[in-house]
Every structure is written in C-alpha cells, then in structure tokens.
C-alpha cells in the first residue's frame, strides 16, 4: 500500500465524498465514502425509512450529489419505500403530488435515474453481492440489514448477525460503495433519548465492531395529554471511526414528506 504523505492526505480527503444533508450531523460527521459501513438503528415508528430517504432524496442529498443509490427493502413493500423517497424528493405529500403530476414529473425523473429501489424479501448477502457486481452502486441501503442474515450453522443469533455485518463490510470495501445497514433497536431503547451500542436488537459486540459509523435515532418520550407525537429526533453518534466525535445531535422529522431537517 502507498502510505506516502501525498497518498494518505489524498485518500483521507475523499472520506466525505457523499455529504450528509442534515446540518447538525454534517458539522460533526461531514459525510461518508465508498468502503464505509454505516449502521443505523431505531425503535419501530421512529422514522428509519424516512431517514435514509431524506439522506438520499432530500435537498442536497446523495442523489443530488450524483451518487448512484440502490435501496434493498425486505420489510416494507418497495412501493411504500418508493413513496417515501418520492415525497422526500419533492417536499410534498402524496396527495399534493397527485394533484400536480406535471410539476413533479421533471424533478422525480431526474432522481429516478439515480435511485433504484428493489424488493429483496427472502434474499441473503450473497445475492446482495451479486447485485453490487451488476449495478455498481455508490451508496447501498440495506433495509433491514439483519434480515439478509443466514441463521443456519450458527449457535446463537448474535453470531449470525456478526457474520452478516462482516459480509456487508466486505461488500462495501470490495465494490467501493458506502453501505447503510438499517437495524431495529431492542425494547431497552424505548422512550429513551440517550442510546448506546448494546441496544441493537439481537446483537452483542460483533455487529457493532464492524461499523465505521453508528447512528442511533431517538425520539422524545410521549407526554400525557399530548395530542400528537413530537417531531424532534435525536441522532446518537455512538461509534465514529471517521471523525472521532461522539455525542448527540438534534433535528426534526417532517413525517408528512419524510424529510429530516435541522
């Protein structure tokens, strides 16, 4: 390997090829690059799908930056994930978009050329690797990452998830793409704002050990008498080999259009 001063500086300058479009996050972790494994976790109904939809299709997102993005969804239907990407791209809910199709068409057509969404129910990581060979994505989203794991041959689930994360990291490095690995958090994270690595569902240390960056998304606990859910979200940066900063940054989720803003 070339470890000359020029080479090291040049390679590290590329660490933020794909910039985050959430200002509070970008100030601490500017972005990601090919070869990075980013593990993202949250409790159900926190906004995991909206999070990656906003990063990819929101204003200044990965697609706007020219990244070829592949989204593999094995939980929600591809059409539902696609709708989240559509609203994040256009900043309007589906009803408003349907009322103004001609206005929406040009913007969405440009996004659609850079974003590929595919149902991957029942598939494994070997299938994911084959797809990467063909499509050569810049950014690969696994939603949900754990559901690509093969459980046969492992004594415990955490061992299977560790092997799955190792495979995801190998794909990131071999095919020079940034992999966003979406995960559920365990019940330990319910109604908590400050989260940690041990709250990953079904995992011990192994899965977390593979990540270059780990972001855990929290929301404010409900308050008695509250008519609707608080839109504030808290991004816990619990592992960060990219810039070394750890802590919590705050933002808001516009759930009607699936955009994270700050």
Task: Identify what each model region corresponds to.
Residues 1-92:
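The Walker A/P-loop phosphate-binding site
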Residues 6, 65-155, 163, 228:
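Conserved inter-motif catalytic segment of the P-loop NTP-binding fold
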Residues 25, 142, 177:
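Catalytic phosphate/metal-binding cores of nucleic-acid and nucleotide-processing enzymes, i.e., regions
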Residues 38-40, 70-72, 118, 180, ...:
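Hydrophobic/aromatic beta-strand patches that form the interior of the parallel beta-sheet core
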Residues 59-62, 88-92, 144-151, 171-174, ...:
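Conserved, well-folded catalytic cores of nucleic-acid-processing
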Residues 74-76, 177, 181-184:
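Conserved H-loop
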Residues 109, 125-140, 170-175, 187-262:
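C-terminal regions of RecA-like/P-loop NTPase motor modules
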Residues 154-168, 178-182, 215-216:
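A short alpha/beta connector and helix-capping loop motif
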């Amino acid at each position: 390997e070339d470890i000359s001063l020029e080479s090291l500086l040049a390679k590290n300058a590329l660490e933020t090829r794909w910039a985050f479009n959430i200002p509070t996050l970008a100030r601490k972790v500017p972005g990601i690059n090919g070869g990075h494994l980013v593990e993202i976790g949250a409790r159900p109904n926190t906004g995991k799908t909206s999070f990656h939809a906003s990063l990819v299709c929101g204003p200044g997102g990965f697609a706007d930056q020219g990244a070829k993005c592949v989204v593999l969804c094995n939980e929600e239907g591809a059409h539902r994930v696609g709708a989240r990407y559509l609203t994040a791209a256009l900043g309007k809910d589906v009803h408003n978009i349907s009322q103004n199709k001609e206005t929406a068409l040009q913007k969405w057509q440009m996004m659609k050329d850079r974003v590929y969404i595919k149902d991957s129910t029942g598939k494994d990581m070997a299938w994911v690797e084959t797809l990467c060979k063909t499509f050569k994505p810049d950014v690969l989203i696994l939603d949900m990452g754990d559901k690509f794991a093969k459980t046969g041959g492992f004594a415990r689930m955490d061992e299977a998830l560790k092997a799955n994360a190792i495979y995801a990291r190998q794909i990131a490095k071999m095919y020079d793409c940034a992999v966003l690995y979406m995960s559920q958090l365990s019940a330990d994270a319910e109604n908590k704002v400050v989260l940690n690595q041990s709250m990953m569902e079904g995992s011990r240390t192994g899965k977390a050990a593979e990540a270059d960056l780990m972001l855990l998304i929290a929301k404010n606990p409900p308050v008695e008498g509250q008519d609707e859910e608080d839109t504030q979200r808290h991004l816990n940066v619990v592992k960060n080999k990219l810039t070394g900063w750890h802590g919590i940054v705050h933002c808001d989720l516009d759930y009607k259009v699936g955009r994270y803003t700050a």
